[in-house]
Amino acid sequence: MDVESRLSLILRYPAEEVITVEELKEILQAGYKLNHYIGFEISGFIHIGTGVVSMSKVVDLQKAGVRTQILLADIHSWLNNKLGGDLETIRRVAVTYYVETFKKIIEVLGGDPDGTRFVLGSDLYHHNDEYWLLLMDITRHLTLSQVRHSLTILGRKMGESIPLAYLVYPPLQVADVFALGAHIPHGGIDQRRAHILAREVAHKIRFYPLEVDGKRVKPVALHHRLLPALNISAKPASKEELSELKMSKSIPQSAIFVHDSPEEIKQKIAKAYCPPREVEYNPVLELLRVSAFREERKTPFVIRRPAQYGGDVEVWSYQELEGLYREGKIHPADLKNAAAEALAGLLEPVYKFFQGPGAKLLEEMKNITITR
């Protein structure tokens, strides 16, 4: 595959930003085998933002010839008091439910489930003196102001009462980039600040230098779009506010989980925010984009409508769909029905997995979330 084709795969939806595209093109042209990584907290059921959106970009990177890695961030999750701060439970869930769910979704999206390396944070850090030297070295090159700035809105608002663990978290994220040799650190757009820190220290640290053909380079940060919460009631004022209004596993009505039944998917989408003609911030349109229009269509996507309202509509691309909706030619109810059908179809193999071989994993997760 030539460089332009690889670049096109990496840059396509759901990618929203690359820092920088020029640097990405340079390291692709070098012909060097590149490493990627994306990290996940272990905190509950996996929703489609974490599962489908993130993994679709992992699959794109696989196809572009990049070594993909998923960091199961158990220590980070413990610092953030996920799953009740029970480190043993966090680790068990990470290497069972999270690994198997991600593998199944990668397979469903057309990727190689065995072609991605899964790394438990504890394993990366265990008996690894160089990692801890790297972490300390990173802290030598960061200011308190920089670390505070990299926190979420909530963290920045906490002022002097912020737990120290929250301030340890960003340097850990930065260290992970270099310890995993990740030329392409990847995450939602809400991870941008941490990746900027990694770029700022890249030429200063002494341990785990990031190189391409013996030349030290900065990590190229890849950020994908965040799926907006279904239950939002108004358009966010900024991208930063949008990051606080994304799908959240802690707010079930805001998210569609990868194990949801077709009936549950339909019920949730029926209640979703979907103003007529609104295309800039519309969760339902985003669901269609990630399910029905992720790949170039070989047959038209059909939006079913009663004959008295004009009958079925055939759509070939997301851009065409967006235009029709903006012009008021598709009713929100018809859009919601189409999104429910498309998403349920995409997730059907995942749903069947959790009804069959993955049933025990799902049951254990339900028991854990109930007791927390």
Curated annotation (Swiss-Prot):
Q: Name one GO cellular component term.
A: cytoplasm
This protein's major location comes to cytoplasm
Where, per UniProt, does this protein localize?
Cytoplasm
Protein residues bound to ATP: K249
Q: Where does L-tyrosine bind?
A: Y37, Y169, Q173, D176, Q191
**Record-stated family:** Belongs to the class-I aminoacyl-tRNA synthetase family. TyrS type 4 subfamily.
Q: What does this protein do?
A: Catalyzes the attachment of tyrosine to tRNA(Tyr) in a two-step reaction: tyrosine is first activated by ATP to form Tyr-AMP and then transferred to the acceptor end of tRNA(Tyr).
Query: Under what name is this protein listed?
Result: Tyrosine--tRNA ligase
This protein's species is Pyrobaculum arsenaticum (strain DSM 13514 / JCM 11321 / PZ6)
